[in-house]
Amino acid sequence: MSPATLLRSPREVRELSRRWRGEGAVVGLVPTMGALHEGHLSLVRRAWEECGRVIVSVFVNPTQFGEGEDFERYPRDLEGDRRLLAEAGCDAVFAPAVEDMYGGGTTDLASGERIFVEAGRLGELWEGEERPGHFRGVCTVVAMLFNAAEPHRAYFGEKDYQQLKVIQKMARDLLFGVEIVPCPTVREPDGLALSSRNAYLSPQERRAARALWRALEAAAGEARGGVRDARRLERAMEEVCRAEPLVRLQYAAVVDAETLQRLGELGDRPARALIAARVGETRLIDNAALP
């Protein structure tokens, strides 16, 4: 199968999307930063099943990386990504350069003259506290992608759960008219959530990284057993991580599944367990619904 059509500029992707819309097609968008794995491809296949046309963006967005993070070394393989996407049902790949999205490129970003989309209080919690400015960058680039691609639907994985909730709220609050479609986390057989950053892990670190899923399972198991005390569930996660020397826990929290506010105890509203840790030098996040 030949690679999907490659688009470089916002104008190109907008013109193509409008042509498809004019033909009566439902347009689906899957935003990614590339280095694609089965988790991304599951989103593309879901979009292909539900939409007439599918656009996948491949853009390593500099504004969602903080100082000292891995923007420069984030894995990039556009040609490999295009081959995978063609097999998954992608019609077009939108892969702009930084200059295509941000005008003057990284120099312009440092000027302080650009307007950004703020993530509000939801974006200040958890990942927002650990990575200041991260969700401002995420909201800004996703808003730009929505404006360029003009999709009917956009597909996001639950693996980045806080990002999903922030984007859902942004789409509602800013009247984008884009349906945000959540998709389940895809995992390795041992439970590790698929992530492009897993490629950074050494074999020893890869084994240690399983502790994140085991921690989430420990909390879910306690909840299934009738434990309602959220702090006890958090301690169950902490204990699993403490037993693995290569894992440095950053947070393990039981939160309301919509507001992401920390809970004192489980109640009638859906709850989520969130976890973030460094395994060696690699930062990983994961989450799970609590019964």
Swiss-Prot record:
Signal peptide: none annotated. (R)-pantoate binds at residues 64, 163. Keywords: ATP-binding, Cytoplasm, Ligase, Nucleotide-binding, Pantothenate biosynthesis. InterPro entries: Cyt_trans-like (IPR004821), Pantoate_ligase (IPR003721), Pantoate_ligase_C (IPR042176), Rossmann-like_a/b/a_fold (IPR014729). One of its GO terms (cellular component) is cytosol. The active site is at residue 40. Beta-alanine binds at residue 64. GO terms for biological process: pantothenate biosynthetic process. It is found in: Cytoplasm. It catalyses: (R)-pantoate + beta-alanine + ATP = (R)-pantothenate + AMP + diphosphate + H(+). One of its GO terms (molecular function) is pantoate-beta-alanine ligase activity. Its main location: cytoplasm. Pfam families: Pantoate_ligase (PF02569). Pathway: Cofactor biosynthesis; (R)-pantothenate biosynthesis; (R)-pantothenate from (R)-pantoate and beta-alanine: step 1/1. Belongs to the pantothenate synthetase family. The reaction proceeds by a bi uni uni bi ping pong mechanism. HAMAP family: PanC. Catalyzes the condensation of pantoate with beta-alanine in an ATP-dependent reaction via a pantoyl-adenylate intermediate. Homodimer. This is Pantothenate synthetase.
